[in-house]
Structures are given as C-alpha cells and as structure tokens.
Amino acid sequence: MRKHSQAIIAAMLALGMAVGMCGCEGQLPTPKATTRQDAPNLSAKQEQKVRTRILKTLDQCNQNRDTDTLPTILEGPELDIRTSELNVAKATGNLDRKTTIPTDLAQAVISTDAGWPRSVFSITSTTKDQQSKRLLVFKQDSARQNYKLWGVARLFSGVKMPSFEISKTGSAQGTPTDTGLVMTPKAAVDAYADLLQNGANSKYASKSADDDLRSKLADLTAQVQKAMELNEGTQQQTFEPVNGAISVMRSADGGDLVV
C-alpha cells in the first residue's frame, strides 16, 4: 500500500510540474543572440502532421501500456511523466482520464528561430468530456531529428493566455535569462517551485495569486496523508526545478510564456 500510494502521488505531482506560467508585462525583453528568420519553421499543415503523428502513437502506447515506444515520440518532462503514468496504469489497471490529450487545435504558436532546438507551442481544444485545454510543447533538437512532445500543461479554469502572433507570422523563442520582465523566466520557475515547496511560508507567497494547481496539490496531499496514517506510513514531497528543463516563447506584447 505504501509503495502504491507513493507511485500515484509521484505521477500526479510530475504532471503538475509541467504547468505554464506567463511572464509579467513590463519593458520589452532584451533581444537574444540567436538569429530570427522571416518565416515560421513550420506551416500550419506541417504542425498538424507532426502533432497528429505523435498523438496517434501516444494513444497506441496508452492503450497497450507500452513504455518502450515512448522515447521515439517523447522527451524531457513529458517522457518522465508519461512513463510514470503508464507504470501506475499497469499496477492499477486504470489510466487517469486526465492523461487524455485532445486532437483538435485552438492555436499553434510556431517558432521563427533559425537555430536549434526549435519549439512549437500548440494549444488544443477542450476534451470530449469538457476537460480543460492542453498546452503542448514540441521540440526539435537538431535538423536531423524529428519533433518530439516535450511538455504538456493542463490549462486550468481561469488561466489567461497571452496573445501570440498567428501561425503564418510565427513567434520568437525566449530564453531562461530574458530580461526586461519583472523576473527572468528561470527566476519565475525557481519562485514557483519555492511556492509549491513552502506554501504560505514561501518568500514569494505575498506576491503570487492563488491558483488551481496549488489548490489541487494541497487537496491531494491531504487525501494521501489520510491513507498513509491508516497504514502507518509517511509521505514527503520535494519540489525543485530541473536544470535546463524550461521552454520559453515570446508573446505578441513582449512578455514570455514559460513552461
């Protein structure tokens, strides 16, 4: 029971850490050194082809509880998260419905950066059972590699997304050290991890509004704690940013969307 509960909460918390955060408005970010081209790296049809290929294979992996194929279509946080989710599904016989990724698209935000890695932020529609939209982050690490799904974030109720250029125009990628904002993207991720770890005792608590992710994590923690106490077990959670696991896209108004 103890190991089983730990596995479930590990999968849930990993999913939560893939949340997107908007950079605060302020001065325009300092331009980064990488080059920008006039056209986006993918057309809308190419984005659809990439997304459809990956999600079709992922659906097959979900149905077969197949973790061996995942590295061919996933990388980074999403590879770790989906592997954990499928391992939990193998043990419980049930795959959480929140792992569903809608196939319909609301908006594609396509990078115009000429170098690598390149990113595409795809915002889906809601699911058939009216779950929230998903933000999908696809990355291509080099010219000789296919795009892979790097991150998935559930866009909780009340989330306000920044405005982006249309897919025909494309958007510039940001960097973890972008300046001209209230804080750099890396500092924003560090601050949010501190909020998750320390809650009301975080030094950033007074500067941050409540959000659904932290509320849901608090509820989940309380539920798991009750189960642990019934079985004379203990639980411990640690939240810290993974070095390099960050993706940034510039919004139309000069802010950053950070995942």
Range-by-range predicted roles:
Residues 22-25, 153, 246:
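Compositionally biased, intrinsically disordered low-complexity regions
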